[in-house]
């Protein structure tokens, strides 16, 4: 399976980079992983609703340019479905069974995802009703994808 993580902005925090590097290494035994960082749009501290939509739209265009036509897209969105780790594993198994070997997970910037990205998504996933920094979500996502592969193969993993 080929997994792409398409995310807005560059990761600067060393502690997050170390965690992401660790899970990327672990995942290499299960899939081909690609992390694609698209540039975030520069935005002032105080923005109108129209300016916020414009920022999301520009970031969305950059995201959509990275999505391949045949990829199954799972967008992380606050109003997405909340899945257990077992459900994520089952969904990934189902995709593989149906020949959908290319999966893209999309993480928006600090303002979230543009409507055009949400419309392109095949599924919307939420980790919580809480809001997390999008950089931290990268690490959590990689850990959950790793956990999903371990569950799928019946390998031990902390519950």
UniProtKB/Swiss-Prot annotation:
Alphabetical list of InterPro entries matching this protein: Alpha/beta_knot_MTases, RlmH-like, tRNA_m1G_MTases_N
GO terms for MF: rRNA (pseudouridine-N3-)-methyltransferase activity
Keywords: Cytoplasm, Methyltransferase, rRNA processing, S-adenosyl-L-methionine, Transferase
Tagged with keyword rRNA processing: yes
Gene Ontology cellular component list: cytoplasm
Subcellular location: Cytoplasm
Binding residue positions for S-adenosyl-L-methionine: 76, 108, 127-132
Main subcellular location of this protein, as a coarse class: cytoplasm
Gene3D superfamilies the record matches: 3.40.1280.10
SUPFAM superfamilies: alpha/beta knot
Keyword Secreted found: no
Pfam families named among the record's database cross-references: SPOUT_MTase
Catalytic activity from the UniProt record: pseudouridine(1915) in 23S rRNA + S-adenosyl-L-methionine = N(3)-methylpseudouridine(1915) in 23S rRNA + S-adenosyl-L-homocysteine + H(+)
Protein family (similarity comment): Belongs to the RNA methyltransferase RlmH family.
Subunit structure: Homodimer.
Record-given protein name: Ribosomal RNA large subunit methyltransferase H
Species whose genome carries this gene: Brevibacillus brevis (strain 47 / JCM 6285 / NBRC 100599)
Gene field: rlmH
């Amino acid at each position: 399976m080929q997994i792409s993580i398409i995310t807005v902005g560059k990761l600067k925090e060393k502690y997050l980079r170390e965690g992401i590097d660790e899970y990327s290494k672990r995942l290499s035994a299960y899939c081909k992983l690609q992390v694609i960082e698209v540039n975030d749009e520069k935005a002032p501290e105080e923005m109108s609703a129209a300016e916020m939509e414009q920022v999301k739209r520009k970031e969305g265009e950059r995201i959509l340019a990275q999505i391949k036509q045949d990829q199954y897209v799972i967008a992380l969105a606050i109003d997405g479905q909340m899945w257990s780790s077992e459900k994520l594993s089952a969904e990934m198994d189902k995709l593989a069974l149906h020949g959908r070997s290319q999966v893209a997970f999309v993480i928006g910037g600090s303002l979230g995802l543009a409507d055009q990205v949400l419309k392109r998504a095949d599924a919307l996933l939420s980790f919580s009703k809480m809001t997390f920094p999008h950089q931290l979500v990268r690490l959590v996502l990689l850990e959950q994808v790793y956990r999903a592969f371990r569950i799928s193969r019946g390998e031990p993993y902390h519950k």
